[in-house]
Swiss-Prot record:
GO annotations of cellular component type: cytosol
Organism whose genome encodes this protein: Xanthomonas campestris pv. campestris (strain B100)
UniProt cross-references to NCBIfam families, sorted A to Z: aroC (TIGR00033), PRK05382.1 (NF003793)
Protein name (database record): Chorismate synthase
Any GO BP: chorismate biosynthetic process
Length: 367
């Protein structure tokens, strides 16, 4: 079976290519009765969209959702939900000269080796255009989690190149095109990105995502660990090369007395574990980070070979993001929400008869 589906009880299957007529997804396992309307998808889809600032790809897609099934009179019916977005701003001619060339750092060569055929237009299925439908599915998961459990999922850009936030304010994240948590640094980011774009190069980034209000008990003890599924979900996003849960790799330099999250009746004293112990949520905020590599489609020449094995220099002239991490925040939020909703439904199915167990350690009031 092709790996285009995600989840166990709450499943999402995406389809479509970057320059095809449309992209879409089928969502199965959504509980009935959730109110949902096409306009509710707009906010997150526009957060992910290209062409919203000079710091992202110039491609401009309307990203208007069509609900094809699974919703009647504004409420989910419990049957598969079909969502579709039509592509309207493809420019496939940009890829004519490189259709037979393998871009270094891109999926061109691996797709060719796996399938023996590939769609070179905009990267085809390997394009981040596919993540549009993950964000759409995430809108449903976010709403259900918020209504049913009070869970709030949100993220921010925590590193762009070598620049890191020098302050933090959640309110600032939605007020700039970088999803940056410190408004005073936005001019510095703009200057950096303007120079990068002029040079024709690209840069990597880091995104942090946090889910507050997650109850204790979600996740499985071995193969369905909450952190392992969250890591896999974030790693499935285009260009992601590393994922951390909680303190992640910084744990290697910590001592046990520092890393362990001490417990009091009033709550945990820290959250180095990222809200997950033994693969199961603790009731604290679930925290994760992902690192995205620099965009590999560049205007600068790079050595490669073509489909005949001849040595060539490739130059990509299409519309591309100089930093894919800028638009990755809503994608990371969506993937965390999808994992959490799937885990919540699985927990309810197996352990719905388990009442509240004492003692119940309070989680963090704010994240």
């Amino acid at each position: 079976m092709g790996s285009n589906s995600f989840g166990r009880l709450f499943t999402v299957t995406t389809f479509g290519e970057s320059h095809g007529p449309a992209i879409g997804c089928i969502i199965d396992g959504c509980p009935p009765g959730l109110e949902i309307a096409p306009e509710e998808f707009t906010h997150d889809l526009q957060r992910r969209a290209t062409g919203k600032s000079r710091h992202t790809s110039a491609r401009r897609e309307a990203d208007e959702i069509e609900i094809l099934s699974g919703v009647y009179e504004g409420r989910t019916t419990g049957t598969p939900i079909g969502l579709l977005i039509r592509n309207t701003d493809q420019r496939s001619k940009d890829y004519t000269n490189i259709a037979q060339q393998f871009r270094p750092g891109h999926a061109d060569y691996t797709y060719w080796q796996k399938y023996g055929i590939r769609d070179p237009r905009g990267g085809g299925r390997s394009s981040a255009r596919e993540t549009t439908m993950r964000v759409a599915a995430g809108v449903i998961a976010k709403k259900w989690l918020k209504q049913r459990y009070g869970v709030l999922v949100r993220g921010f850009l925590s590193q762009l190149g070598e620049i890191r936030p020098t302050g933090f304010d959640w309110d600032a994240v939605e007020d700039n095109p970088f999803f940056w948590p410190h408004a005073a640094q936005v001019p510095e980011l703009e200057t950096y990105m303007d120079a990068l774009r002029k040079s024709g190069d690209s840069v990597g980034a880091r995104v942090d995502v946090v889910a507050g209000g997650v109850p204790p008990g979600w996740g499985e003890p071995i193969y369905g660990k909450l952190d392992s599924e969250l890591a896999a979900a974030l790693m499935s996003i285009n260009a992601v090369k590393g994922v951390e849960i909680g303190d992640g790799f910084a744990s290697a330099a910590q001592k046990g007395t520092e890393h362990r999250d001490l417990i009091t009746p009033e709550g945990f004293l820290s959250n180095h574990a990222g809200g997950i112990l033994g693969g199961i949520s603790t009731g604290q905020a679930v925290t994760a980070s992902m690192v995205l590599k620099p965009t590999s489609s560049l205007r600068l020449p790079g050595a490669t070979v073509d489909a005949d094995g001849a040595v060539v220099d490739v130059i990509t002239t299409g519309r591309h993001d100089p930093c894919v991490g800028i638009r990755a925040t809503p994608i990371a939020e969506a993937m965390m929400a999808l994992v959490l909703m799937d885990q919540a439904l699985r927990h309810r199915a197996q352990c719905g008869d388990v009442g509240e167990v004492s003692p119940l350690i309070p989680g963090q009031a704010d994240v």
